[in-house]
Each structure stands twice: as C-alpha cells, then as structure tokens.
Amino acid sequence: MSTTIWILLIIVALFGGLVGGIFIARKQIEKEIGEHPRLTPDAIREMMSQMGQKPSEAKVQQTYRNIVKHAKTAIKTKK
C-alpha cells in the first residue's frame, strides 16, 4: 500500500478512537452522577440554613429524594 493510504487509515482510526472514547466516558459519567448525586443531605441542610430556614430532617430527606428522582428520570428520558 502507498504511504498516503496508511496515513489516511491512521487518521481515521485516531478519529474513531477519539469519538468512541468520548461517547464511553460520557455514558460512565452520566451513570455515576445518576447513582451518586453530588448534592448530599448535608449540603441541602447547609443551604436551607443559609436561606434562613430551619431544616427539619423530614424536609431535608424529601428534598434529597426529589433531587435523586429527578436526576434518574432525566437520564432515562435522554435514552
């Protein structure tokens, strides 16, 4: 084969690997965030305190469950 064809094959392979790597990394990050949201009950409690609310445990857990539920439904609707 000529050198030009080899160079084109290498460029196509690199581009395919780049696109595939980005796709796989994106799926893994979405899965990780869906399973373990970055907003924890402690962070919600702190935000409520800063807004002047007295955070009851029931309200904190309700807010946290709503956030987790929303994140999971957002991922499912993307698919």
Curated annotation (Swiss-Prot):
Membrane topology recorded in Swiss-Prot or TrEMBL: Single-pass membrane protein
Alphabetized UniProt keyword annotations: Cell membrane, Membrane, Transmembrane, Transmembrane helix
Any Pfam family matching the protein: UPF0154
InterPro entries according to UniProt: UPF0154
GO CC, alphabetical: plasma membrane
TM annotation in the entry: 5-25
Main location: membrane
Transmembrane recorded as keyword: yes
Compartment(s): Cell membrane
Family under the similarity heading: Belongs to the UPF0154 family.
Protein name: UPF0154 protein SAK_1616
Organism: Streptococcus agalactiae serotype Ia (strain ATCC 27591 / A909 / CDC SS700)
